[in-house]
Structures are given as C-alpha cells and as structure tokens.
Amino acid sequence: MSSVSNDSPPRGFVAVYAFGYVGAYVALITPVATTLALKVAELDPAGKESTLGLVSAIGALFALVSNPLAGALSDRTTSRFGRRRPFIAIGTVVGVAALAIVGFAPSIPVVVVGWALAQLAFNLVLAALQALLPDQIPLVQRARVSAVLGIAQQVSPLVGIGIATGVMATGAGMGPVFVVPGVVGAALLALLVVRLPDRRLEQAKPFVLLDLVKPTPGTGADFGFAWFGRFFVILGFAIYTTYQVYFITDRVGIPTEQVTLVQLAAVLVFSLVLTASAIVSGRLSDRLQRRKVFVYAAVVVVSLGMVLLAFTTTLALFLVAAGVIGVGIGAFFAVDLALITDVLPDQEHAAARDLGVFNIANALPQSVAPAIAPIFLAIGGGGNYTLLFLVAAVLALIGAALIAPIKAVR
C-alpha cells in the first residue's frame, strides 16, 4: 500500500495529530526554553553560559544522529503495530525517563547524559510525527495542516512553561519541573498512539547504514536549497530561544525567580500572534498554491523582530519583539514544512528518512547556536546581546535567500 495519502484523513485525526505534536514539544522544548538553563545555573552559576552551550550542543548532536536514523528505520518497519507508532511509543517512554535523570541530576556530567538521552529519544518521536504529514495528509491540504502543526509546536512552550511555573511555585525542586511536563506530553502522545491509522508495511528492503547518507534517487538541488534555507532560519531563531533566559535576567534585569513568569507572558504574546499568522498564511498558501513568497515575507518579519530585540532593554519592548518574531515564525513554520514535503524525492518509500535528514536542519542549529553565540557575546567586554541578535537577523535572511533557487514549488 502506498504511504502517500491522496485522501482526506479520518475525522478528528488532525486534532489528535496536533495534540501529539504539542505533547512531544511540551516534553522537549520546555527544557530548551527555560528549565535546562535554570538547572545549569543551579549547578554552575559562575559558568552558566558556556556550560549551557556545552550541554545544548551535545544534546543537539544526539538529535542530529537520532532523527534520520529513526526515519530510515521507520520507513522499513514491518511491525503489526505500523511503521510510525512503535517509534512514537518507545521514544516517549525513554524520553520521560531521561528528563527525570536531568531533573534530579546532582552534577553537570549527569545533566549531559540525561539530556543527550532525552534528545535521542524524543527525536525518535519527532521523526515519526513528521512522516505522518505525507503519510496521512493529501498535498492540497498540507499547508493548512502544517499551519496547525506549526501552531501546536509553538504553543507548546506556553503549555510547558505554564506547567513548569506551577510546579516551581510549589517548591518541589527541579526534578518535578522536568518530569511533570514530560508526563503531560506523554499523555498527549498516548492519545495519538491509540488513534493513529498507521499503515503496516508488508515488505521492506533491508536497512543499510549507507542509506543514511546516500541521497534518495531523484534528489536534486531543490532538496539542498530547502535544507540550507531552513538551517539558516532556524539558526537565527535558535539564538533567540537558547539565550532568552539569560537575556531576560542580564539585559532586561528580571530577577531569576521571576524569569518563568516573564517567559510565560512572552510566550503567550508569541503564541497568540503566531496562531493568527500561521492560520492565515497556511490557508492562503494552499489556496494560491504558492510557498516561496510566504517564506520570504515570514523571514523578513522574523529578522525585524531580532533587530528590535537587539536594542531592547525593557520588559515592554521585549514583549513587543517576541510578538513580532511570533508573527514571522508562525508564517514560516506553516508554509516551510509544506514546501519541504513538496520537494521530497520519494514520498512513498523514503518520507521519514528524508524528513529526518531535513530535521537535521532543525537539530543542528541547536548545537551551532550555543557554540557561536559566546563569540559574539564576548565582543566589547561581554554581554553583547545587540550584536548577537543582529547576527541572528542576518542568518535568517540568508536562509530566505536560499529558498529562491528552488524550482519544484512557486
């Protein structure tokens, strides 16, 4: 049976699919957005910036390997439970256990081990989730569904930070701050596991490790331009997300104990404008069957938000900048995922593998951003967030420029 859907998905599936996305990202992005930085600051307050960079980079490297490997294996899985369901289930269980290791870690080395395992496990989940788009959603609906998934992904920090803030208010310590969002995420993913109309593959060619790096037949320049375009946009955005906590405390001057409340306000603003932007962009993109013009406009708006952030010193301006970035990134995630699935060379037999390769463009910036950011922060005596976010704006614009040569989509 073909793995590419030409029929509308079952009633209610898109909602369950979106809840699964929320679950995965509540578990994984809550640490990225706030709690991992707080855990590192608790264990190493003097060297928190460089230590966070190290922990984030190692975790991102594990994500880098896990996603395409899981995708290739998922494409070949002949389990009676389907091709995608086993990876979602196993990755979720292991991921929640890994979050517990991070939360209760007594030292930075234990944090590194736990976070690497969490990234590996949840990228098993993400590889399967992304493959459901070409598996279950017809081409003419993909931008709209991508918009819903983009909203789900970006609303997840709001849910996760809200949960983390509530847990922190109880004085329970950092362990439950990691575990509780993970358990909530697992519950949402369990709903998808139960409801997923997963197709069973009757026969598959053997897995060869070389397949991870060997291009899928039909892969052309469009695939490469789409990959590098996303990489640079996400790299600019990753600088914002990775250093948001320290920007709030060091530049805006918010006390550490109030950081999660400020982040909650920022994510609320971010999520509201993102939702509106994603819905409008996704519908227009599907109606017009155009992708690139929406990506260009989205990235310009993201870059404007980064420039505003570069010169921000007050809480009010920080929230405005978060809103501007939300408008742009909402449109970007809504349309770019649809663009990516449009240029996949073999949607029937290698969708998860190729989407896993594309997800490297999501994961690798999480490693590169904390590696390069301290260089710019250190210029001029340290804490140079102005230069850092100007660089982030330029990186995003480079990503938009790389979309232009793509020929398979308009």
What are these regions (language model features)?
Residues 47-50, 139-148, 260, 346-358:
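Loop-to-transmembrane helix entry/capping segments in MFS-fold secondary transporters
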Residues 66-81, 276-290, 377:
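Helix-to-loop junctions at the C-terminal end of transmembrane segments
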Residues 349-379:
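A late C-terminal transmembrane helix in Major Facilitator Superfamily
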Residues 62-64, 143-165, 359-370:
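Glycine-rich segments within core transmembrane alpha-helices of 12-TM secondary carriers
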Residues 2-60, 222-254:
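Helix-loop boundary and gating motifs at the non-cytosolic
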Residues 48, 83-85, 168-183, 373-396:
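A membrane-interface helix-boundary motif in multi-pass transporters
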Residues 84-100, 293-308:
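Structural signature of the two symmetry-related core transmembrane helices
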Residues 103, 187-196, 390-410:
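Multi-pass alpha-helical transporter architecture, strongest
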